[in-house]
Amino acid sequence: MGKPYINNAVIGNGSMLGCITESGELIRLYWPEIDYPQHIEKMLTGFFGFNNNTGTIWFSEGDHEITQRYVEKTNILETSAVLQKLNLSVTQTDFCLPDSPVMVRRYYVKNTGEDNIHLGIGLASHVISNEIDIGCSMFDFYLDALVHYRHDCCWAITSDIEVREFQIGNNPFGAVWERKLNGIDSIGMSPDGALLWDMGILQPGAETGLTLHMTFSTSLNELKKTALDIKQMSFDELYGITKRYWNNFFSGFINTFTGNERIDRIYERSLMLFKLMSDKKTGGILASPETDEGFTQCGRYAYCWCRDAAFITRAFDEAGMYRETERFYEWARNVQDIEGFWHQRYFMNGNVAPSWGIQIDETGAILFGILDHFNYVNDIDFLKRMWSAVEKAADFLIRFIDEETGLPCPSFDLWEERMGEHTYSTAAVIAGLRAASEIGRRLGVSDEKTQKWLKAADSIREALEKELVDKTTGLFLRSVRTKLNPWGAEPSSNTVWITVNSKGYSRDVTLADSRLDISLIGPSVPFGVFEYDHAVVEKTAKKIEDALYCSKAGGIYRYEDDSYAGGNPWIVSTLWLALYHIEAGNVQKAADYFKWAVKCATHLYLLPEQADKNDGKACWVIPLTWSHAMYILVLKGLMKKAGKHIFDNI
């Protein structure tokens, strides 16, 4: 079954993550990690009258009038629908308990018609299944619940009202549609099943409700214990626990109040999203909930990139989420390759995720980020715990040098598209080596080692100015020795053959790529290799602004001729330029870009990866953790430079 690409809303608790569409359908549910495994193939809830012939009306399908909101300052989601054919108003409330492997779903139903209705509610559920890990189902009479189970996981759908009918397999979705389930088999090698409840007679104007609990465990006996405990608690108790948790969540962090409701709501939503995207068990940071399991449009998103995390952890620190930052760097220390570098991307459990090449900027960014966090918290014990990782990474970076150019060896760029020797990656390596040297100095490490790293950083900086600045235009080149066509011969005659690994394999590469790219801001912001007023930085930033601005919808494209997902302006690239303008003292220009990003947020105050180039509406990945991080960084930067009055006209 195909899934929508857009996750309109997310709920969770750091070990469970649920993704919900704008119509309220739960399309993805992860546990015990926020990236794996995903359990939901399909789940629908239907409403019907036993005493009429209207048929079953699916809550999340059809042309219902739908509204959706988060309960203020919580990750509790409410989706309301008007089911006109049944004269019902239904509100679905979804949340995950803060400290239990349980998702709660509550239906409030009101009869808005003039006639009685004998109300029935049916639920059909299909668990993920494959030939390696067969999904099976049973009806557990002890729990009065539908139970799905696989190799290392089981989960139950229990309720606060007794189940009237159930069915295992044999097209349970169709059975709910027909309003009659066949429970003659209570267990089977089938990934799907259904439940049906008799809600009784609902008079005009009357209300009723049904609470569902989706409880997870690694064993059936433990599942039964937990599910029974949850069933004994009322919905009001469960709701109250969750609401208090999220309301208290903000007390330990830095409050930022601008007086602009939309700006402040996005800030609050960003912090709550950060909590959901930070894995409770490991500390890994999820780039985004998955959108494309089938690799039909992209390389997938439900992984941890160290590059994104270096920006995200700075946003954590700006918001006072210091423990989340520290847990990430502890995770990074644990997953570091024995050679000293970090791979392209990881699962939350620390295993290497599907990848296609090292991206050396990520190793530099981790070192930069470790020192950056220390500058916020001044915790020397943190540096001591990180030292072994810092030392291995810095030593790797000074070995990873192209002897002919003096730049870091070819690796993939930050957009993961081109192999080459890139300006952004080079700046990240310089910043990383400088950070490692400073960390060593702070820890009293011998000057010989720290000076070796610092000398290497200075040498690479000289190579950057020599090799990666276009002498004709005075602009940064995006890359040299770069593979513009990964599938065949290069599209230019300005090429050279280079050896790509120690086994002697070689390929042709283009000598220079002069395309403008927002990452060319990187040598100044965030890495500080050059000051904002350095001649090449200033000229490149001006050219980027002129060439990459989207005249129709606003915002900044990633780079010239970007075609990914339609080629739209990105939140990250737009706010990156805003950060540069904050450094340069152009606070009003930065505020203008920030205003654009504020407009791009969804009605649930979530920020996408991109905004449509024609109408500026949020598109593609929602939410993107990196986008929210950049939002925090620009917001804080504007507050520091100009005060909250800068937001008066946003």
How would you label these PLM feature ranges?
Residues M1-R262, E318, K640, K644-D648:
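Terminal accessory carbohydrate-recognition/targeting modules of carbohydrate-active enzymes
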Residues M1-F50, Y301, I312, F347, ...:
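C-terminal capping/lid segments that line or modulate ligand- or cofactor-binding pockets
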Residues F257-G283, A332, Q336-F341, P354-S355, ...:
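Active-site acid/base region of carbohydrate-active enzymes
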Residues K110-N111, Y301-E404, T426, I430-L433, ...:
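Aromatic-rich carbohydrate-recognition surfaces in CAZymes
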Residues G62-I76, T256-Q297:
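Conserved oxyanion/phosphate-binding beta-strand-loop segments in alpha/beta enzyme cores
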Residues T158-E165, H422-T426, Q451-V572:
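Extended ligand-binding clefts on enzyme/binding-domain cores
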Residues S288-C298, W342-I358, E403-E421, I498-Y505, ...:
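Acidic/His metal-coordination segments adjacent to aromatic residues that form catalytic metal sites
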Residues N255-Y267, T282, F316-Y329, H373-E391, ...:
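Structural helix-adjacent loops and short alpha-helical linkers that scaffold large soluble proteins
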